[in-house]
Amino acid sequence: MKNLYISILVLTAVLMAACSSDDEIVSKQPANNDNVVTQTTTVDFEDAVITRALTDAGLKTFAVGEKIAVVYTNTSNATVKVESAALTAADITPGGKTAKFKVTMTDPKASTSVTYIYPAAMADANGSPKLTALDTQGGTLASLASNLDYAQFTGTLTSEGALPETALLANQLAVCKFTIMNSTGDTDITNTITKLTIIDGTNTYTINRIADANPIFVAMRPVNNANFSFTATGNYNYEKTVSSKTLAASDLYPINLAMNLNQTISHKEAEQTLTIPATGWYTIQAYGAEGGASTTNAGGTGNSKLGGKGGLSSIVYQFTQGQTLYIYCGGKGGNASLGTNGGGAAGWNGGGKGGDGYNSSIGGGGGGGATHVATSQIGNITNSNSLFTGEASSPTAKSGLILVAAGGGGGAYKSCAAGAGGGASGGHGTNAQGNDSYSGGGTLSTGSHGGAGRDGTSGNASLTYSGSGGHGGGFTTVASLSDQYQSYGGFGGSSWGETTNGKSYATTAGGATDGGPGKVIITWYGTSHP
């Protein structure tokens, strides 16, 4: 067995920097040989503490403590991976252009291939590049330079089995320097971003970071003519797609990435706000909440019925940067239970309570709450706070109201189906005889002015034992019902949109097909509307 202690001279290749225009990834020119390696340190050499750095200009140096992995074939024809001794200050030449690594090899086979992988952490146990290390990154220049800035040399052992005296490391990765901008590209929002996910069609990179104003550095595999998708998370969620771009190894790409808002606001029993990140047009989709079921059976089969689905309303609306939206997402109506207190709870934001059952009979499901969006703090819907004022024949929206998606009605026993929320008029509820013609769902002119849905009627001994479903929030009917139809499914509310300034308003009864509580989705549309 022969142990060799060999010092090798290794040179780094260069990462050339070139600026790109917003969202552009552009080709780079070949490196200038005069700038193959430039020294970059964070402290004086006299301190004997040398920190390797990849600078914003894309220049690389060696640092004390670094190692390379050496992969070779031994005389038994086995592949062997070893790591060099850690660099000392004396091993690094002035300027950081070269470094001497001491490597111990056992029985190397002469005139066979040898590979250097730099840094050693980028080599797996079998001596292959550990590219999976790129999948999750920290986004800082320091962490990338120390752990992920993968370079490689492939050569041949001498006829005596010695390492080549000199080697030139070739960079294997592209490095992207991302600055995250708002949709119009006029405001830097990098300081709000805590997570960036990049997909190039084949590979996925996830960058988790503490939000700060520094650019986000990402080491990436070279690709040719690839399509990229980006998602960023911070105060809000953003997305972007970029088509047909190339990343070349050994290049640094400064990229200003203008990203578009794509934010979902889920239900809370409280007012929520969103600050508009860029001036322009946005699509708002509001989903009303589902009504509760008059059943303990999740399927709502037989004599029991699930609540009606909430409505879906959408509009395209223009906002200015910094403007605040006030968002109220309706709560799902509560499911009924047995007994005198068995009516389902009213869904938050205007749903009606389900009627109680008589004695041990089951109650009606609670009505689903409405969902609405406004540019002023108009509050959530209650019995004392409606979204509209004035007469029923000509109601006036409160200042700032943009969009309402009504809630669905609560279900009732004996196959009394609930009405779906939404549409120009809310869906009918049916009674125990299957008759829905005696009264319809709420409409803009025949309703409670965007107010709370009516509570369901409780059962009694003379007419029916089961409670009725609560009405959905929104423009819910307040018409009286005949006593003979006291057990009925709750009516769905109707929806509304501000069409004087808003564009492309649409509403669909029961459009919240996934059911559950209300929500709002706000996405960037563009700087103009056709």
Regions found by a protein language model. Give the residues of each.
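Short loop/turn segments at secondary-structure transitions that flank enzyme active sites
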Residues: D22, N74-S76, A120-D124, T184, ...
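Sec-type signal peptide cleavage vicinity
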Residues: K2-N262, E271-Y282, Y287, T320
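Glycine-rich strand-loop-strand elements at beta-sheet edges
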Residues: G288-S376, G410-G442, H449-G451, G459-S462, ...
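Residues within well-ordered beta-strands of beta-sheet-rich folds
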Residues: T115-I117, V175-T179, T283-Y287, S314-Q318, ...
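Acidic, Ser/Thr/Pro
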Residues: N262-L312, T320, G333, I381-S386, ...
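Short, structured beta-strand segments at or near domain termini in extracellular proteins/domains
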Residues: T371, D514-H529
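Residues that flank catalytic or metal-binding motifs in active/ligand-binding sites
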Residues: V64-E66, T112, A174, G280, ...
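Compositionally biased low-complexity segments at domain edges in trafficked proteins
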Residues: A142-D186, I255-N262, N335, K353-G363, ...
